[in-house]
């Protein structure tokens, strides 16, 4: 050809092979029949280290799935562990000087004095009756007078037997468990008769309930017996002791009290309010014993 290039030699062979379609179709499917395996991209070490650092900077409590999968131990105090409510302090042992309140119900036909005495002996605690309500029948009372009136049968020794049914207006006193000094307990009662008269005195057992009787009481485990009036600080030592000792011995340390003698309220409470009715001894209508009871001499002090 006159074109400007020579078709002879190596260039002509290259040009000839380029324009041969049969050779082109034979060589084309070779890479499809035998594809070369492509190498998998390997993770770079620098990128892996950066990912580990980013995971470690994350809060372990914010992503529980990631922290559980990696098995890393979370640092610091777990959330919600502070300011937990503390359990309340419960004292299971009672103090020996604690007072317990009781509501005692005495069944109809039972002896009130015997029931309270048995309760105090079995529990080993003193019982102080604060109030009571209900009805009783055939009551025996100890009065300063030996003569009875208004249909009551009199008896010697100041004991008056009242027959019939009476309503309890007030019932107070103290019952102590053994060992206790004689005369340290007892019950005093005020009753209302069918005609409206008020009768009161110390209870002489039995005191039979003619219906359900409700008693409001307080119990205690120990009591101290002391003699009044107390001695002065400069004088002899005061007398005192536990209830079971019957008064205690002399020569004890004097209590730090004033020199004025205290009132007799403590002695009256310890003896079961046995002298609580003496203030009504001069009123014959209040006690219901008539003029003979008013003219009788007052009862000597304990």
Curated annotation (Swiss-Prot):
GO cellular component: nucleus
Keyword field contains Transcription: yes
Chain intervals for the UniProt region annotation (Required for the binding to non-AHL interactors): 164-169
Disruption phenotype: AHL27 and AHL29 double mutant exhibit a long hypocotyl phenotype in the light.
Cellular compartments annotated: Nucleus
Region (Disordered): 1-95, 229-279
Function field: Transcription factor that specifically binds AT-rich DNA sequences related to the nuclear matrix attachment regions (MARs). Acts redundantly with AHL18, AHL22 and AHL27 in the regulation of flowering and regulation of the hypocotyl elongation. Acts redundantly with AHL27/ESC to modulate hypocotyl growth inhibition in response to light.
Subunit (UniProt): Homodimer. Interacts with AHL5, AHL12, AHL25, AHL27, TCP4, TCP13 and EF114.
Name of the protein in question: AT-hook motif nuclear-localized protein 29
Gene: AHL29
């Amino acid at each position: 050809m006159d074109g400007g290039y020579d078709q002879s030699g190596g260039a002509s062979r290259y040009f000839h092979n380029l324009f041969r379609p049969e050779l082109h179709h034979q060589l084309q499917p070779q890479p499809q029949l035998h594809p070369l395996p492509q190498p998998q991209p390997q993770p770079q070490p620098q990128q892996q280290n950066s990912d580990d650092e980013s995971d470690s900077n994350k809060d372990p409590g914010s992503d529980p799935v990631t922290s559980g999968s990696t098995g890393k131990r979370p640092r610091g105090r777990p959330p919600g562990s502070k300011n937990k409510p503390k359990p309340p302090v419960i004292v299971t042992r009672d103090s020996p000087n604690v007072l317990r309140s009781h509501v005692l119900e005495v069944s109809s036909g039972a002896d009130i004095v015997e029931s309270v005495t048995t309760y105090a002996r079995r529990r080993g605690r003193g019982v102080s009756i604060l109030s009571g309500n209900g009805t009783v029948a055939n009551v025996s009372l100890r009065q300063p007078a030996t003569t009875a009136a208004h249909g009551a049968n009199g008896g010697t020794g100041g004991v008056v037997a009242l027959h019939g049914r009476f309503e309890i207006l007030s019932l107070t006193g103290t019952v102590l468990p053994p060992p206790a000094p004689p005369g340290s307990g007892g019950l005093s009662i005020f009753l209302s008769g069918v005609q409206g008269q008020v009768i009161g005195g110390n209870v002489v057992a039995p005191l039979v309930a003619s219906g359900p009787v409700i008693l409001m009481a307080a119990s205690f485990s120990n009591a101290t017996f002391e003699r009044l009036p107390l001695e002065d600080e400069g004088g002899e030592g005061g007398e005192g002791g536990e209830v079971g000792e019957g008064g205690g011995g002399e020569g004890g340390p004097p209590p730090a009290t004033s020199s004025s003698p205290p009132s007799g309220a403590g002695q009256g409470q310890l003896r079961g309010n046995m002298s609580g009715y003496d203030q009504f001894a001069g009123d014959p209508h209040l006690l219901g014993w008539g003029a003979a009871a008013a003219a009788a001499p007052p009862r000597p002090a304990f």
